[in-house]
């Protein structure tokens, strides 16, 4: 297996595009996958190739006689194929009792599916600075030691130099500064640089509603993200957006209430 890791702006996207084109030139097939539908859509957009969610590709639903609802591991019918998985940091190996997908351990199932055919290879791409799956300290899919436990050799390529928007992007500049603090175990709160960059605007509280509304109008709700430090604050923001921007003041009703 090959693991390609790197922080934002280090060229992972460019490397993946070049890799896919090179494999195509050598007449080697590729299958692109990602853990979520959104990640698969992004992967497909920048490679201009079809991309699937991992679940859609590796599982199939049981027939009615076997018990409709559960999904079992699909047979890998590909030959001499590279399976390229983006956003691999999100792949969990935590078993869930209520899971209807395979063993319930996605990483186990992914590796078993790919290596049903010895001519197939797996490439995992991701950012180790991103949060690991829920209830896990490290991302198992980007942990070389854990991957080697499956019995194969893991080659790793780590991209460390920021190549994209180093000077132009304040978001990338601040993210890199925070990451360096974490790597060096520095204590205290980070100091964010905001005035030197054109892609960062400081918004006063009194102007926040208008700023969010303008972003919704210009970019759309799906492309506007609000990040806050706690679930409590997130709930407050969501309620405020519903009431003051989307004009949905009614309370959310549960399905049981809707049936009354």
Per-segment meaning from a language model:
Residues 15, 19:
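Hydrophobic positions on the alpha1 helix immediately C-terminal to the Walker A/P-loop
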Residues 29, 79-82, 118-123:
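Loop/turn-to-beta-strand initiation segments
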Residues 1, 113-120, 128-254:
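Conserved helicase motor core of P-loop NTPases
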Residues 31-83:
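Inter-Walker segment of RecA-like/P-loop motor cores
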Residues 7, 35, 229:
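P-loop (Walker A) phosphate-binding loop of NTP-binding proteins
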Residues 86-88, 128:
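Walker B catalytic acidic pair
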Residues 258-259:
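Conserved small/polar residues in nucleotide/adenosyl-binding loops
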Residues 2-14:
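Walker A/P-loop nucleotide-binding motif
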């Amino acid at each position: 297996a090959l693991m390609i890791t790197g922080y934002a702006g280090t060229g992972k996207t460019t490397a993946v595009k070049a890799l896919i084109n090179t494999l195509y030139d050598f007449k080697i097939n590729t299958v692109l996958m990602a853990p979520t539908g959104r990640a698969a859509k992004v992967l497909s957009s920048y490679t201009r190739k079809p991309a699937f969610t991992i679940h859609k590709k590796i599982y199939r639903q049981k027939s009615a006689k076997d018990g409709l609802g559960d999904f079992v591991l699909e047979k890998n019918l590909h030959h001499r194929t590279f399976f390229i998985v983006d956003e691999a940091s999100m792949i969990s190996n935590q078993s869930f009792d209520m899971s209807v997908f395979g063993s319930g351990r996605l990483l186990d199932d992914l590796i078993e599916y790919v290596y049903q055919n010895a001519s197939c290879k797996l490439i995992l791409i991701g950012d180790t600075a991103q949060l690991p799956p829920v209830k896990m300290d490290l991302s198992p899919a980007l942990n070389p030691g854990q991957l080697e436990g499956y019995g194969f050799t893991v080659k790793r390529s780590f991209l460390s130099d920021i190549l994209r928007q180093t000077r132009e992007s304040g978001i990338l500049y601040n993210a890199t500064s925070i990451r360096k603090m974490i790597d060096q175990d520095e204590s205290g709160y980070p100091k964010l640089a905001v005035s030197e960059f054109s892609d960062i605007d400081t918004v006063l509280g009194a102007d926040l509603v208008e700023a969010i509304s303008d972003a919704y109008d210009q970019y759309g709700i799906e492309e506007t993200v609000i990040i806050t430090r706690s679930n409590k604050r997130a709930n407050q923001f969501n309620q405020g957006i519903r009431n003051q921007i989307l004009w949905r003041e009614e309370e959310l009703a549960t399905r049981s209430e809707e049936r009354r």
